[in-house]
Amino acid sequence: MEIILLDRVHGLGSLGDKVRVKSGYARNYLIPNGKATEAIPSKIAEFEARRKELEEKQAQRLAASAQRAESLNGKILTVFAKAGDEGKLFGSVGTQQIVAAAEQQGLQLERQEVMMPHGTIRELGEYVVDLKLYGDIEAQVTVRVVVAE
């Protein structure tokens, strides 16, 4: 199925690209989430009419994400967790706990933005965590896992 992207989609393309994807991916994810529209003549004309508006919206999101990256970069987030004598956690620290720690400091962060390619944190200590905010805009925060008393 051919579609026109209304937003940047990782692995597919950016705004205005005409790409071919599987029908299920388009119908069940891209189109309902407003990331794409079918590439039929009427929809193409509608997209071209809205193109400038969508490009401005994307530019605003990029600028806002760059500003957020600047404010988040280098921050230290403290997460409290129960741990044994050897520093092993009872459970683990994942994206949800990192987002909660950011919110406690007044920082806005979403679970999808936290990248943990090596899995959850299972020991006390400091860890550098990558954040993928929007498109190519990334930031890094330090997560300090300490014992909860």
UniProtKB/Swiss-Prot annotation:
Pfam families: Ribosomal_L9_C (PF03948), Ribosomal_L9_N (PF01281). Keywords: Ribonucleoprotein, Ribosomal protein, RNA-binding, rRNA-binding. One of its GO terms (cellular component) is ribosome. The keyword Ribosomal protein applies. Disulfide bonds: none annotated. It comes from Dichelobacter nodosus (strain VCS1703A). It comes from the Bacteria. Binds to the 23S rRNA. The keyword Transmembrane does not apply. This is Large ribosomal subunit protein bL9. Gene3D superfamilies: Ribosomal protein L9, C-terminal domain, Ribosomal protein L9, N-terminal domain. InterPro entries: Ribosomal_bL9, Ribosomal_bL9/RNase_H1_N, Ribosomal_bL9_bac/chp, Ribosomal_bL9_C, Ribosomal_bL9_C_sf, Ribosomal_bL9_N, Ribosomal_bL9_N_sf. One of its GO terms (biological process) is translation. One of its GO terms (molecular function) is rRNA binding. Belongs to the bacterial ribosomal protein bL9 family.
